[in-house]
Amino acid sequence: MSDKWDQRFIDLAFHLSGWSKDPSTKVGCVVVGEDREIRSTGFNGFPRGISDDNERLTDRAKKYPLICHAEENAIMHAARIGVSLKGNTAFVTWPPCSRCARSLIQAGIREVVYPTPQELSLIHI
């Protein structure tokens, strides 16, 4: 991490990842403007209104078609409340998949920050 603020936002993303009910993968995302103001947040989970019962969460054939990644949820939340993410930075607990990287670019995110493998090895969740 480059400074104490980067670490704070990564720590917050890890906190948000704990909100995910997915038993196997927990990812959090915090999108921050140039003024260090939080613009949006997200964690991986099912869309609003979709039951997140244990059967769906543990059956990959049922889970994967429905699950929204943390980055997607942060982008969709910002769109829902009318907040532009253009020029912002996304802090994510894990390197984005190619689909999320594409979505972050399309949303105008200028930078993505995530822990290095060495930093991840020091984190105990």
Language model features by range: what are they?
Residues 1-123:
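Zinc-dependent deaminase catalytic domain
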